């Protein structure tokens, strides 16, 4: 991998990680369109450490408060009913599905799941799901045709059941094209959470999974066509770009609809199918044994 490739891929990772359009799919597609090697699951996982570092800094006050309350709850029973302490436990509970499935499906994640036909399918299907979830949220917020505004849930209403559902939604993102934020935000909206609450828990929930996955994949850096230098460079680029994107996105969702992302996902999936059908792109473009 050249330094230019690592810069472009780091830029793509930073731009797309927090948007509900799938960063792993865009890394895969960028390499395929450019005629580069597929960066692979290891590069994707490690570059995501950069964007998760952006989450750690952006939500540093929330995270510090949650960690402090969670650690105190281990020895102080009176803290176990504290909202922040419970949030710490719910992030752990919500991380279980992706941990189990990530280990179980490792071979599929690094192979069949990177087929461009599957990516096109998930882009379209999950785009439709996000669109439905967005419309339901908008109906509650505006009252729909009957003008009956429904109060949506916040993170104070989050329990173990909803936390696990969020977790399984996150696990779906092991398939490129699904989108970690897209799946978890869609799940949150369908369960009745506000846009801001759904996005906030989505980003907090991703921290353990992404950091663990990136740490696990460190052993594969230096093998094949991905070396340490370009990988670290891409991770740094992803961090700086990702921080700017998450700051913008958290403001965007308070007043705007997710429909632009829905339309983009569906159009990208359709175009990808057309290019594959026309023979312009191979479903396995960029894949190699190294």
Curated annotation (Swiss-Prot):
Could you list this entry's UniProt keywords, alphabetically sorted: Antibiotic resistance, Cell membrane, Cell shape, Cell wall biogenesis/degradation, Hydrolase, Membrane, Peptidoglycan synthesis, Transmembrane, Transmembrane helix
Recorded GO CC terms: plasma membrane
The record lists the organism as: Streptomyces griseus subsp. griseus (strain JCM 4626 / CBS 651.72 / NBRC 13350 / KCC S-0626 / ISP 5235)
Q: What HAMAP family does UniProt report for this protein, alphabetically?
A: Undec_diphosphatase (MF_01006)
User: What's its top-level EC category?
Assistant: hydrolase
Where does it mainly reside?
membrane
One GO MF term on file is: undecaprenyl-diphosphatase activity
Miscellaneous comment as given in the Swiss-Prot or TrEMBL entry: Bacitracin is thought to be involved in the inhibition of peptidoglycan synthesis by sequestering undecaprenyl diphosphate, thereby reducing the pool of lipid carrier available.
Q: What is this protein called?
A: Undecaprenyl-diphosphatase
Known function: Catalyzes the dephosphorylation of undecaprenyl diphosphate (UPP). Confers resistance to bacitracin.
Catalysed reactions listed for this entry: di-trans,octa-cis-undecaprenyl diphosphate + H2O = di-trans,octa-cis-undecaprenyl phosphate + phosphate + H(+)
